[in-house]
């Protein structure tokens, strides 16, 4: 399947109507951001990753499968990066409205599933809230918010522990992937900033974290002067290629599993509270 040939916005309206009404019709909406990614990576880093990885995943899917993609949402929720020039951010309220309005229209067309294919870590929680609200309003359509880096097999063997734990932004992983996908967009500076290990002046209190079980609501300026959180000096084209293959393999299997399922379950509405 050619990802470029599965663009929902490039269909004429009769084709779009037919696509949306296919059994199990699934739309994938890639989400990125327009935000600083250190002095070496472009503002569109997350949008580019979501777009390129999704197109590559589509190339590994059977052309007969009822799945299409929407244009990438290239401006997202990025308040943590706003002190840095170039960053553009929508409000949380506007993001919720955006997902609700677009998702509601897709549901009314007959779409069975909407996947929010997100590459920006700063809007994971917000898209989960948006998905839950949309699912409640449109119970006939499944809504699946996902983060492209979550649950990917092989990352632990490809990245050192320090980068897995603290390389959150424009560090080794993102710089390597960009070196592989679009090397012309990578600047010469490869900084390291924010040593957030035990004893660091910028480390969260004991038992708390930047992400994970007990996260802090941090701003990039709390942690870094350059916008990099991690060590971009470790980046390489070879690692970027390995990361791309891990991402493609992971999401190809996830989409195949979804498309072969009957999710969301169909069930009758139960009155609550139940009468004894």
Residue ranges and their predicted role:
Residues 1-113, 121-276:
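Extended, histidine- and acidic-residue-enriched regions that form the cofactor-binding/catalytic faces
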């Amino acid at each position: 399947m050619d990802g470029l040939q599965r663009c929902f916005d490039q269909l004429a309206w009769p084709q779009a109507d037919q696509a949306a009404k296919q059994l199990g019709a699934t739309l994938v909406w890639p989400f990125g951001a327009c935000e600083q990614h250190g002095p070496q990576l472009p503002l569109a880093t997350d949008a580019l990753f979501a777009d390129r990885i999704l197109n590559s995943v589509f190339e590994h899917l059977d052309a007969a499968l009822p799945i299409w993609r929407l244009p990438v949402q290239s401006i997202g929720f990025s308040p943590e990066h706003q002190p840095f020039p170039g960053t553009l951010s929508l409000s949380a309220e506007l993001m919720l409205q955006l997902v609700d309005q677009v998702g509601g229209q897709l549901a009314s067309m007959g779409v069975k599933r909407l996947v929010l294919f997100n590459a920006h870590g700063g809007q994971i929680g917000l898209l989960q809230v948006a998905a839950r609200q949309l699912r409640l309003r449109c119970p006939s359509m499944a809504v699946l918010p996902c983060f492209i880096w979550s649950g990917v097999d092989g990352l632990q063997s490809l990245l050192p522990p320090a980068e897995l734990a603290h390389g959150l932004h424009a560090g080794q992983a993102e710089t390597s992937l960009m070196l592989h996908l679009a090397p012309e967009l990578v600047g010469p500076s490869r900084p390291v900033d924010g040593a957030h290990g035990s004893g660091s002046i910028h480390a969260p209190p004991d038992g708390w974290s930047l992400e994970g079980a007990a996260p802090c609501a941090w701003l990039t300026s709390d942690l870094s002067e350059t916008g990099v959180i991690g060590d971009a000096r470790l980046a390489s084209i070879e690692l970027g290629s390995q990361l791309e293959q891990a991402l493609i393999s992971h999401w190809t299997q996830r989409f195949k599993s979804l498309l072969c399922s009957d999710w969301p379950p169909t069930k009758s509405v139960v009155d609550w509270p139940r009468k004894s």
